[in-house]
Design a protein with these regions (language model features):
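Short amphipathic helix-loop junctions that connect adjacent transmembrane helices
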Residues: 30-47, 235-252
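Cytoplasmic helix-loop-helix junction between adjacent transmembrane helices
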Residues: 107-145, 328-329
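Pair of pore-lining "gating" transmembrane helices in MFS-fold secondary transporters
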Residues: 5-33, 37, 211-231, 313
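Conserved MFS/SLC helix-loop-helix module at the cytosolic interface between two early adjacent transmembrane helices
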Residues: 62-95, 99, 276-282
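Structural signature of the two symmetry-related core transmembrane helices
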Residues: 79-94, 173, 283-298, 378
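Residue-level signature of mid-helix packing/kink "hotspots" within the transmembrane helices
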Residues: 58-66, 116, 149-150, 262-270, ...
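Paired small-residue
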Residues: 91, 102-110, 295, 306-314
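Juxtamembrane intracellular "pre-TM" segments in multi-pass secondary transporters
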Residues: 1-7, 188-218, 403-404
Length: 404
């Protein structure tokens, strides 16, 4: 019965992750254009406002995630899924009717408070799937949010063309309302709450694990992963404009090149998760960081669009393995009663990585050039590669999270 429950939940949560990430990424490409309709802003002002509006979500998320993790260990993962999907639906609706940028900024801050559908999906699946299949399960789930991330901008552009900006935000709100209903009706959780007296603080929670140093290292690697992932995409179009001889189709080409890592991730994440279960998640994490480093180094020098595109596609295979393997290592080293809190702390480091990556991308590329930006990404990958061996876990110390 437990086997049937976690597999069914995986299917529902895969769809929920796809819709959730899709709804979020639908907003990304049209937000700067929407802001232009709300006032007489210059290009630089729009760029600054866009950066602030996107960054506030991650900053709030970084602060609030540990609180939600503590609550999830007391109330269960399902209430957190409903909180996140319902909250995002409300935020999309608020943006759709926003009369000015201040309301949009507030909506995005609220989104940071109620975010976490994908992270709680990962935490639920990690707690329900057998330890021997955690990599496969998390890898499969990763294809859902990656597919949403991949298709969202394309769908957003089409919807905005036919329904306008506000209509697109309304559709995103309807998508998240659908996810809320599906999660409410179909997701099952046999939850055994942790008594409030047994809920520890952050330091005590980490010390209570068998290998807290491994968990802390995974947190740092997670931040580095998110920083590298978010450093490149914001500058893709400007970078390509430098190396293309005919930039007339720049928007289309930029979209296609940006999608290549996502395509590779969707194609390979499930299989790579299986390899991690078979040969060890630390090995998979190390190889993924090594491949990422090798594929980023030539991007410092490449000026040919075809070679650059191939390298971006190959980078996607690295991305496909990184977060699932890191999350599987967390699962193996965390007592199931603390899993919600540990995953929420990891979510905080993900959010910090997102902010750091965006800042890295904009500042370094603006003052030192695009080649220097790729060099900094390589340095971050190398730091992760050096840390990866320290996540190795003695098999006898693994914590089985599927005992429920």
């Amino acid at each position: 019965m437990k086997e049937k429950v976690w597999r069914r939940n995986l299917i529902i949560l895969w769809f929920g992750a796809f819709m959730s990430e899709g709804a979020i990424s639908i907003i990304v490409p049209i937000m700067p254009l929407f802001l232009r309709t709300l006032g007489n802003y210059s290009g630089k002002e729009v760029n600054l406002l866009t950066g602030l509006i996107f960054s506030i979500t991650f900053l709030v998320k970084a602060v609030i995630s540990p609180l939600w993790g503590k609550i999830s260990d007391q109330k269960g993962h399902k209430p957190m899924l409903l909180k996140a999907s319902g909250g995002l639906a409300f935020c999309c609706l608020l943006i759709a009717v926003a009369p000015n940028i201040l309301i949009i900024f507030i909506a995005r801050a609220i989104q940071g408070v109620f975010s976490g559908y994908i992270n709680n999906s990962e935490s639920m699946i990690a707690s329900q799937a057998p330890a021997s299949k955690s990599g496969l399960a998390l890898g499969t789930l990763a294809t859902g949010d990656t597919a949403g991330l991949l298709l969202g901008p394309i769908i957003g552009g089409v919807l905005a063309t036919f329904f306008g900006f506000r209509g697109t935000f309304l559709i995103a709100a309807l998508l998240m309302a659908t996810v809320f209903i599906l999660s409410l009706v179909l997701v099952k959780e046999d939850f055994h709450p942790v008594p409030k007296k047994s809920v520890l603080g952050i330091v005590e929670t980490l010390r209570a694990q068998k290998l807290p140093q491994v968990i802390i290292i995974v947190f740092i690697i997670t931040m580095l992963i998110q920083a590298t992932n978010n450093a490149v995409n914001p500058i893709i179009s400007m970078y390509l404009s430098k190396i293309l001889h005919n930039p007339s189709n720049l928007t289309l080409i930029s979209g296609l090149v940006s999608a290549l890592p996502g395509i590779a991730t969707v194609l390979s994440a499930t299989y790579l998760g299986h390899l991690g279960d078979r040969f060890g998640q630390t090995k998979l994490l190390g190889w993924a960081l090594f491949i990422g480093t090798i594929t980023y180094i030539p991007q410092i020098f490449i000026t040919n669009i075809w070679i650059f595109s191939i390298l971006r596609f190959l980078t996607g295979f690295s991305i496909a393995a990184l977060l699932p393997s890191a999350q599987a290592i967390l699962t193996q080293n965390t007592d199931h009663k603390s899993l919600g809190r540990i995953f929420s702390y990891n979510q905080t480091f993900q959010a910090l990585g997102n902010v750091f990556g965006m800042m890295l991308s904009s500042i370094v590329s603006a003052y030192l050039g695009y080649a220097s930006m790729f060099l900094f990404v390589v340095i971050l990958e190398l730091i992760g590669l050096l840390l990866a061996p320290f996540t190795r876990t003695n098999k006898h110390l693994k914590v089985k999270t599927s005992s429920r």
